[in-house]
Each structure stands twice: as C-alpha cells, then as structure tokens.
C-alpha cells in the first residue's frame, strides 16, 4: 500500500479492513473522506451572499427614482427598477461622524458617547464594529476608505481599509463584505469651486433655473443660492456615474447574481437647515438595495418595489449580519429588516443633534411615517448659531445678506429667530418642509402627547449620555474607560432617570423653580448643571435662587456647573462676578470647559466687554486638545468680531 494511503487511513482512524477494498472502492472512500469536507466548505461559502455597500455623503433623496425629474441619475434610476427603494429611511444624526458611529456599531451615538461632532471616544470592551463578526464567519471585509467613526476602530475591524481596499483581493470563493464611499458630494463639493470642478469634470452641468424648481422655500431664491443648488445636483450626477462604474465592475467579474448591493447616504443635503439638523432635509436619505433572486426571502427585495417601511441607518449593521446568517449581538440597538427571523417593523425612528463643531445645541427628534416631533433642550440658543464651516458657503452668506436687507421669504424668516420653540410637531405629509409647528394646535394634542412620551422613553431606554456636559463625559471616560460606563455601569444607579427629569424640568418655567432649586444640591454635576440652566432660562423670575447660584459658581467642583451658574446670573442682571469666573475657566479650564465658557461669553454680547482682554489672550491654539483647541478659537474670534466690529477670519 502506498505510504500516503496509509497516512490517510491512520489520520482518519479508518479500520484495517479498508485495506481489502478494491481500488475503485478506495477511490470512492478517498473522495468521501478527504474531498467532500472541502467541497462542503466551498458550497457553504457560495451559499452566503457577497454584500456590497455603495455609500455617499450629504445628499437627500434628490434622485430621479425618488420623483425628481430634473436629477440626472440614470444608473441609480435603473438600479431602483432591479431592487427595492425605501421612501422612509433616516439617519440618527444630520452629520456624518455621529451617524457613521451608529452605522458601524449598530448603537446610538448618544448611548456610546460618540454624539459630539469631532470627538475621540472609547468603546467598551464588549462592543465591536460589526464587520468583525463577519470576519469571524469567514467573510473578507474591506473599506474604501472613509471611517470617521468618532473612535479608533480595532485593528482587526477590516481585512483592508484604504484607498486600495477592494473585494477583488479576497481568496478564491471567499464571500466578501465591501464598502466604497463616494466623498465628492460632501458639502465641500458645493462650497469649494475647485473641488466641484474636479468632481464634475466631463459632465454636462444642470441648468440652474431648471433645478431651482426644487429649491426649498427656506432659502432665498437668488443667483448664488441657485448656483449652490445646481452644484448639488451636479455632484449627485457625478456620484451616479461612480455608482454605475461599481455595478459594472461587479457585472464584469460575474458576481452580480451572487452579491446583495445596498446604496445609502450618510445624511441629507450639505447646506444650511439640512446638514446638522433633524428636519427631514437633514435626516431623510436615499436607501435602495438589490437582492439576487436566490437570496430573497418571501417578498424581500422584489425588483421595482417602493416601500414606506421605516428604516434607521442604525439598522444597516444588524441587517448585514442577518442576511449573512449571523445573529446580531443582543447589545445592538438597531434591528434587522432583511433576512430570517425579523422583529416587528419600526414604529419610530430617532435622531439626535449635539455639538456641531464649535457650537452646542442639544436637540432630539422622533419620526413616524407621518409625524415628526422635535425637542429643543436649549431653545434659548439662536436657530442659526454662527459656525465657521457653513458660514463659508454661499447659501449661508446669502441668508445673512438677504436677512439684513429685510427681504427674506416668510419660510426663511422662521429660521432667523433668536430663539427656538421648546417642542415642534410637523405633519410631514401635509407639510414636507416642516414649516408649520402644530404643537399649539388642539387637533394634534394627542399626537403631541404620544410623540413626547416616545421621545422620553427613548432617552430613558437608550441612556442618552448627550444630556451630560462634554467636560463631565471626558472625566467619566477617564475614570471608567468609556463614556458608555457612565450611565450603564454599576455605579450609575438612577442617574439616567434623574438626568432625564432635570433636563425636562429646565424647560418647565417658573412654576418648576422649587424643583429646579432642589436639583442644585444633587450629587451629580450633570443634574446640577441642568438645574442652573433651567433657572437661567427664566431669568429674574428665578431670583430667589441667587444665593445657591453664587455658591455653585464659586465653589462647585465642576466647571460645567460653574459656567451654567454664571450664565444664569448674567441673565438675571448680575454679571460682575460671573464674568470673572468665565474668564478664569477660559484661562485654566479643560478644552470642553473652555469652549462652553467661550460660548456663554459670545452669547452675552456686549456684557462681555469687561473681560475683552482675557478673550483676546485666549484666542490661541493649544496643543494637546482636539484640533489644538480650534473650536474655542473660532467662538472667541466670532465674539471679538462682534464686539470690536472687526472681520478677522480663522480656520
């Protein structure tokens, strides 16, 4: 008997009587024992779908297949006839990084502490980016190439993540999950003329007056806004060309029938009152997918179908795992909408806005198929806070210019208000641009109540860490290892509920003053913070709290609480000591404490003049801070320009 045959028999513990088999029988046995396991592996690999994500940035569903005939999107329009188009898909934030954090983890950014734009959070040990589960199951996972997750992803998240990452580098017959991101339609592709020209090179550009027919009513209709809107359509066409190239590559490789393709955008239009906001202009996105016939379950993925099923992009990760035959981990807050063993369809989707670059504004949103509810936790902040990035764009500049002339259209004037409503409710079927707030309409009182309750239940269930000041989150991360631990760890107690109630109380007015004063003695800084904010909101009606506010401002261990107390005293007409405290925090505080102090000084306008020199001295970059502390520099630059009548520009 040949030696290799003996070795095979020994390795597989075959009985010695095998030696008496005929050569033909032996060959059959050889195939059964040796080859079939390998063939089974290959068959299992072939049975699992490849999954291709083609994502883009900063676009709402302004595509031909979504009913915009002036959009030039032939590849996506054709793709929609081959797959399923979702009319009610939404993001969890109106800006890229917090949304991408939710997508890659299947968890809300407000649970993880990745909610502030441009932060550096840490994940708790048990939470992993979902591609790691695919890799463990044998998938080849690539990302080309944007990450922007708000945390440093583990090294084994991807097999490859770079501008060269591609599914074609996988092993033979290995299933793949590949992501390609088109960045050309980012807001910078509209605002930056050179980028716009590069992205749209070789394309026939849209007629500006024609596409202006879809210009939203909250923009002034001027040549410059029409130009921005036309550029927006142009970069969408460039993206459509890119999309078609990726589908063609899949066809050329003979993989179209083996690959589920999902197209989505990371948030809405990259223009004011859309990007960064929780209106549909910022939250509603295109979502189209194509499922080869052999991978369809029931009615899932039938070609040419439009569905109004509510989808949140937090569901993409769990869905991708589910269609790959992997049970999503229990900690994920997203839910699968394709594959086997699906949960009940969503009744609500949720969104959050927190710090956008250099400006804080805590806003939450709840959406059903018809209604949108918005809770403004800081309604005394002006609607259009000054932020460097959007202010560089022509549309924002036109809004400012036309507002100064007093000729803004009524819809645009709504968003020049120095304050916001505490709550907003919109019937998106009758009012798709969300201009008519129904909160005070008696016919919608029950709907308002239901949506408000859904919001508070979500805040509680998901443990919304966005209600904690960022400087306090930073301290908690250092103490516990991750922001998640602050409200989910063993020491949290009922902090989650106390925080929710204190934040809600801050908007309750003078009648809630005794309860707000009580929160000033809470043992957690975040609760004290909201008590001071609430008292400041009612200005001189909270005068009986002045002694407690003075004590907090001078003695509290938390700079966030001291800043909130100083703000309250300034709003009550007692700025002297308050300005000194804000100046001291500006000099010596941590980066996020300094930013909050700078914002309060900016919001006090000319009241801040006594600390003008301190503001000038602190308009400097500091190493060791996120982006060298540029956000504080931006706020101080804006404040100084207003106080001095200057026009200095900072990056």
Residue ranges and their predicted role:
Residues 3, 7, 12, 45-49, ...:
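Long, internal low-complexity/basic segments
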Residues 8, 38-39:
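Short, basic, low-complexity termini and linkers enriched in Ser/Thr/Gly/Pro
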Residues 1-25:
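N-terminal secretory signal peptides that target proteins for export/translocation
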Residues 26, 41-417, 432-453:
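Formylglycine-dependent sulfatase
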Residues 26-38:
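Bacterial N-terminal signal peptides
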């Amino acid at each position: 008997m040949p030696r290799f045959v003996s070795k095979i028999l020994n390795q597989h513990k075959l009985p010695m009587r095998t030696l008496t088999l005929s050569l033909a029988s032996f060959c059959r046995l050889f195939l059964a024992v040796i080859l079939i396991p390998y063939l089974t592996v290959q068959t299992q690999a072939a049975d699992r779908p490849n999954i291709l994500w083609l994502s883009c940035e900063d676009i709402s569903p302004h595509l031909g297949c979504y009913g915009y005939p002036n959009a030039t999107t032939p590849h996506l329009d054709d793709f929609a006839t081959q797959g399923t188009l979702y009319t009610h898909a939404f993001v969890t934030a109106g800006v890229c990084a917090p949304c991408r954090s939710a997508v890659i983890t299947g968890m809300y950014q407000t649970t993880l502490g990745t909610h502030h734009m441009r932060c550096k959070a840490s994940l708790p040990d048990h939470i992993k980016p979902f591609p790691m589960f695919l890799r463990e199951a044998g998938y080849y996972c690539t990302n080309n190439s944007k990450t922007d997750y708000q945390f440093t992803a583990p090294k084994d998240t991807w097999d490859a993540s770079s501008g060269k990452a591609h599914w074609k580098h996988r092993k033979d017959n290995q299933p793949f999950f590949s992501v390609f991101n088109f960045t050309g339609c980012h807001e910078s592709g509209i605002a930056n003329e050179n980028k716009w020209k590069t992205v749209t090179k070789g394309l026939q550009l849209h007629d500006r007056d024609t596409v202006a027919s879809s210009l939203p009513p909250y923009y002034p209709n001027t040549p410059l806004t029409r130009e921005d809107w036309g550029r927006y359509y142009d970069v969408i066409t460039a993206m459509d060309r890119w999309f078609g190239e990726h589908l063609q590559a899949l066809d050329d490789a003979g993989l179209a029938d083996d690959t589920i393709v999902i197209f989505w955008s990371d948030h809405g239009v990259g223009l004011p009152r859309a990007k960064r906001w929780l209106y549909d202009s910022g939250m509603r996105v295109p979502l189209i997918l194509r499922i080869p016939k052999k991978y369809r379950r029931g009615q899932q993925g039938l070609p040419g179908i439009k569905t109004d099923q509510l989808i949140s992009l937090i569901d993409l990760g769990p869905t991708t795992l589910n269609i790959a035959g992997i049970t999503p981990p229990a900690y994920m807050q997203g839910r699968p909408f394709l594959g086997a063993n699906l949960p009940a369809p969503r009744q609500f989707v949720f969104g959050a806005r927190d710090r956008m670059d250099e400006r804080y504004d805590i806003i939450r949103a709840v959406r059903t198929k018809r209604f949108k509810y918005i809770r403004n936790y800081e309604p005394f902040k002006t609607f259009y806070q000054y932020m460097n990035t959007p202010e560089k764009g022509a549309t924002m500049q036109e809004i400012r210019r036309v507002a100064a002339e007093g000729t803004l259209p009524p819809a645009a004037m709504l968003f020049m208000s120095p304050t916001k409503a505490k709550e907003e409710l919109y019937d998106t079927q009758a009012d798709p641009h969300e201009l008519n707030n129904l909160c005070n309409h008696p016919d919608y009182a029950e709907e308002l109540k239901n949506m408000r309750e859904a919001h508070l239940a979500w805040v509680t269930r998901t443990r919304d860490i966005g209600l904690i000041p960022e400087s306090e989150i930073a301290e908690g991360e250092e103490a516990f290892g991750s922001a998640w631990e602050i409200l989910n760890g063993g020491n949290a107690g009922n902090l989650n509920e106390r925080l929710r109630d204190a934040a809600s109380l801050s908007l309750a007015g003078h009648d809630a003053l005794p309860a707000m004063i009580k929160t000033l003695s809470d043992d957690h800084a975040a609760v004290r913070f909201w008590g001071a904010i609430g008292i400041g909101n009612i200005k001189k009606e909270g005068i009986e709290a002045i002694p407690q506010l003075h004590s907090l401002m001078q003695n509290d261990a938390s700079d966030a609480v001291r800043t909130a107390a100083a703000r309250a005293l300034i709003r009550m007409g007692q700025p002297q000591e308050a300005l000194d405290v804000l100046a001291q925090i500006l000099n010596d505080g941590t980066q996020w404490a300094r930013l909050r102090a700078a914002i309060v000084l900016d919001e006090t306008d000319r009241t801040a003049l006594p600390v003008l020199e301190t503001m000038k001295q602190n308009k400097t970059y500091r190493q060791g801070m996120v982006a060298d502390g540029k956000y504080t520099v931006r706020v101080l630059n804006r404040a100084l320009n207003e106080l001095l009548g200057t026009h200095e520009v900072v990056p």
